[in-house]
Amino acid sequence: MHRPRLARRSAPLALKLQRVEVRHVALPLRRPFETSFGTTTHKEFLLVGVSAEGVTGYGECVADFDPYYLPETNQTVLHILRDFLVPLAFGLEIAHPRELPAAFARVRGHEMAKAALEMAVWELHARREGVPLYKALGGRGGTIPTGVSIGLQPTTGALMERVEEEVAAGYRRV
């Protein structure tokens, strides 16, 4: 069985964060997206950037602006990041991102806030190691087909028309 050789350092480089930045982003959708919760015209999210030694990694928080679908919101995530997780992270010197969940365990819940910061650290780690993020996470490569979510449509005919449009646009999963 062929096993890929990985370049290994003689000792892991300690990672100590020097900067954390959280940005609020609002991206307009190509068309309104309607669900039983209402109609969305843009997607709001938080983008977390972490830097160390001139390298930056980014993580996205997928919470919404309201708590109607998920318990965490952009505002609660911002609060937990600013007042708890970022101060914890600044006090750490870690050899690998796998150490973060244990460090964050004292903060109960708030998994989206933790995931956004942890993913940013994972990307920073991958960039420092000079490997794609999927490899740093243990992935094997290859392609993954993307899909599209259509949302509610006024009629079955309108729904079928949208499905046909998306399939024609190249989506294999609708």
Spans of features found by a protein language model:
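Metal- or metallocofactor-binding catalytic centers and their adjacent structured scaffolds
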Residues: 6, 51, 56-128
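Structured beta-strand/loop patches that form or line metal/cofactor-binding pockets in enzymes
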Residues: 6-69
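A common structural microfeature
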Residues: 45-47, 56-58, 114, 143-145, ...
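Short glycine-/small-residue-rich flexible loop motifs, especially phosphate/cofactor-binding loops
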Residues: 47, 123, 163
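Metal-dependent enolase-superfamily TIM-barrel catalytic cores that perform enediolate-based chemistry
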Residues: 135-174
